[in-house]
Amino acid sequence: ELTEELAGELGLKVDTEGFKQKFAEHQEKSRQGSTGKFKGGLASTGEMETKYHTATHLLNAALKKVLGPHVHQKGSNITAERMRFDFSHPAKMTDEEKKQTEDLVNEYIKMAIPVEKLEMKKEDALKMGAEAMFIDKYGDIVSVYKIGDVSLELCGGPHVKNTSELGHFKIKKEEASSAGVRRIKAILE
């Protein structure tokens, strides 16, 4: 009502019926999307998005090895063209640390490690040492993705079947995201 009133003062007309229709469509899409499964913010499950999603697990593992166990994923954003990965770390990465991280991810890719999906109770996954970013978003039964001895994480997927499918990993940029959080932008070639 307020919107219509303000629009009227400006000589504009509001398509109330059109708005109601679009709002109802949005509500229905939201209902369909909330099936109780957490997808980790991945909007699309195309081939490249799937590859980048698996690459985030390898990058997380490599960062822990290069920078230390204080590293934890803080977020990610994946498109068909690139990946963005936010992680806890107090300082800018050196060129050597970036090179070591990139080389380690590429080593994991060349190792052709099978990617296994395991289903189990959330508490059992945590006892196994599986990492979980948004633990409250998962149900009682979770999917855990195991990439050899490299990575073990709760995740909604999707993932490639083998790390060899990823191609070559390249860090394009490393920058501050917020206090104590760094951001890596990377591509697969």
Language-model regions, residue ranges each:
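A glycine- and charged-residue-rich anion-binding loop/surface
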Residues: E1-E189
